[in-house]
């Protein structure tokens, strides 16, 4: 099947978004509207127009999303072409660039990447070395403050010179936070290591301080596409802007009514103000929801780009809201309702139900309620394979072999 045959599978709004390539574009799309399909087919369309695969940069937020998109593109264009695309998460793509340009920022090209656990371990040792009260300088708080600083492009030097931040730390009774940040960065550099936030910070510094390097990648990436743009933070947004502000060959896809990562620094204004940043930006709205019934499609958020979201499915059951007085009552009610719909109504199998909870800590009481009623269930998620103690030990040995200077 060629690209044109794939385009015939799209509705009119989707097709318009895919074939437009005359300037910057914003695809505003709700859940279930086919925005990933649009991004995938747009890449395939650009390849058909003759763009070399290595000149297309596609940024996603998860490895799973990147993998699925690459598989879909491979089905259209062939595996060899799909493999040559620059497609991946912000962190994976920019770590690749930083390894290529490591000499400009004072890091070895084989620098280690610290995950959240490695970062916490190093911060814990620094807090202990400084003989600070860990009930005041709480590990999670310290890590979060440093992460927020980096995502706002505030280096430890800038942090020390920022009167507002220093005063805020004094008022919060954590005046030595800037010293922890300084020691943390010094130890990372000494070990030849970066954490995830450094990958974004250092890429911005690289592009800011080395115009020739920025120019090289501006010319190299002839088209940039970004998924889930509403979840970008300041550092990510600025990198994309630096790469695209001159040629304007950019397409971002996002849902302005769905921003759930503000605690990580995500800024909804990045998508709301996109049209003002790029002259001549075209906005495409994917308003048809293929996933949900009409009663699930909600359009009451006023702070978003105007669009009429609709579903062609039947109305379905109305959404019901239950307020419980305790977590135990919540678990009991959920289990009882599942039992009622499965047993008494007889319309559903247990596999038709899904329970979503905000934190993993909530699962215990829900599991207990399900077990009491003999309802079978399966937990999805849990501890990542790479977070298991024994796996992290093996990875640490590999790190020592690859980078002997990493003593952390």
Region annotations inferred by a language model:
Residues 1-109, 113, 215, 269:
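P-loop NTPase Walker
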Residues 27, 31-39, 280-282, 287-376, ...:
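Helicase P-loop NTPase motor core
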Residues 23, 51-55, 81-83, 246-249, ...:
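Short glycine-/polar-rich loops that comprise or flank the Walker A/P-loop
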Residues 93-101, 257-262, 291-292, 381-402:
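Short alpha-helix plus adjacent loop in nuclease-associated cores
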Residues 3, 8-19, 23-27, 38, ...:
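Conserved helicase NTPase motor core
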């Amino acid at each position: 099947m060629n690209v044109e045959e794939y385009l015939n599978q799209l509705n009119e709004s989707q097709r318009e978004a895919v074939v437009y390539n005359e300037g910057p574009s914003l695809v505003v799309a709700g859940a279930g509207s086919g925005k990933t399909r649009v991004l995938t087919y747009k890449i395939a369309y650009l390849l058909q127009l003759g763009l070399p695969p290595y000149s297309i940069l596609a940024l996603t937020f998860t490895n799973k999303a990147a993998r699925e998109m690459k598989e879909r593109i491979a089905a259209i264009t062939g595996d060899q072409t799909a493999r040559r695309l620059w497609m991946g998460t912000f962190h994976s793509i920019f770590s690749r660039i930083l390894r290529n340009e490591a000499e400009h920022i004072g890091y070895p090209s084989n620098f280690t990447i610290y995950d959240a656990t490695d970062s916490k371990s190093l911060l814990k040792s620094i807090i202990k070395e400084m003989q600070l009260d860990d009930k005041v300088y709480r590990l999670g708080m310290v890590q979060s403050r440093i992460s927020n600083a980096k995502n706002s492009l505030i280096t430890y030097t800038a942090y020390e010179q920022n009167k507002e931040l220093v005063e805020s730390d004094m008022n919060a009774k954590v005046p030595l936070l800037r010293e922890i940040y300084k020691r943390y960065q010094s130890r990372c550099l000494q070990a030849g290591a970066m954490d995830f936030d450094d990958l974004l910070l250092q890429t911005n510094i690289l592009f800011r301080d080395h115009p020739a390097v920025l120019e090289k990648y501006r010319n190299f990436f002839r088209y940039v596409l970004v998924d889930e743009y509403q979840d970008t933070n300041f550092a990510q947004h600025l990198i994309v802007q630096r790469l695209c502000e001159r040629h304007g060959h950019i397409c971002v896809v996002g849902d302005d009514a769905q921003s759930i990562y503000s605690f990580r620094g995500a800024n909804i204004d990045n998508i709301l103000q996109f049209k003002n940043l790029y002259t001549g930006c075209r906005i495409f709205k994917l308003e048809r929801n293929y996933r949900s019934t009409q009663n699930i499609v909600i359009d009451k958020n006023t702070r978003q780009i105007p669009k009429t979201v609709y579903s062609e499915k039947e109305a379905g059951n109305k959404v019901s809201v239950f307020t419980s007085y305790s977590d135990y009552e919540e678990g009991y009610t959920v289990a009882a309702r599942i039992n009622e719909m499965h047993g008494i109504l007889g319309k559903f199998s247990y596999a038709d139900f899904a329970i979503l909870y905000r934190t993993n800590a909530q699962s215990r009481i829900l599991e207990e309620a399900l077990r009491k009623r003999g309802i079978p269930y399966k937990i999805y998620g849990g501890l990542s394979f790479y977070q298991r103690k024994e796996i992290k030990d093996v990875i640490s040995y590999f790190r020592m072999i690859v980078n002997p200077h990493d003593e952390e």
